[in-house]
């Protein structure tokens, strides 16, 4: 004969209140310093202004309103933590934050990247975040230097300048 003893179940196996299924998770704020170019700071300000304007006429607490509020909290946080990095203009000896770096691949094709802040990065526009693998490999590089990453292969720095 089997007898069972009913003991309280461990809290680890009890699902806590999951909250509203439509609740949106907050956007992740990077723990890395929020370095931005002057253009990046302006873009963050425009983004915050745009979100505030779009939120103004929206009634209630629908999904769109909650998404806009979440995005506004994110970009207000990014704006508040922004550290503008000033850089030289014109030609430069070394690649640093804000630099536009001209590169040549082994096959002879050209590549141009700008080292920018995390929120400014847009690979399709040649803008790479300062903490990306490629940007970190480029930091301190000089004209004629060869850098290599797993994703890009070997690249030769052909020019460095600042906007």
Regions found by a protein language model. Give the residues of each.
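Helix-rich terminal scaffold detector
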Residues: 1-78
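Non-DNA-binding regulatory cores of transcription-related proteins
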Residues: 86-155, 161
């Amino acid at each position: 004969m089997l007898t069972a003893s009913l003991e309280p179940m461990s809290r680890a196996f009890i699902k806590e209140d999951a909250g509203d299924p439509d609740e949106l998770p907050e956007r992740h704020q990077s723990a890395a310093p929020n370095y931005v170019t002057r253009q990046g700071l302006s873009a963050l300000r425009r983004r915050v202004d745009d979100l505030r304007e779009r939120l103004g006429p929206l009634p209630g607490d629908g999904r769109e309103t909650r998404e806009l509020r979440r995005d506004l909290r994110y970009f207000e946080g990014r704006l508040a933590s922004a550290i503008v990095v000033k850089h030289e203009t014109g030609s430069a000896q070394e690649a640093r934050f804000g630099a536009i770096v001209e590169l040549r691949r082994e096959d002879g094709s050209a590549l141009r990247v700008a080292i920018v802040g995390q929120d400014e990065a847009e690979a399709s526009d040649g803008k790479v975040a300062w903490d990306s693998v490629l940007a970190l490999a480029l930091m301190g590089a000089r004209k004629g230097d060869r850098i290599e990453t797993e994703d890009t292969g070997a690249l030769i720095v052909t020019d460095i300048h600042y906007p």
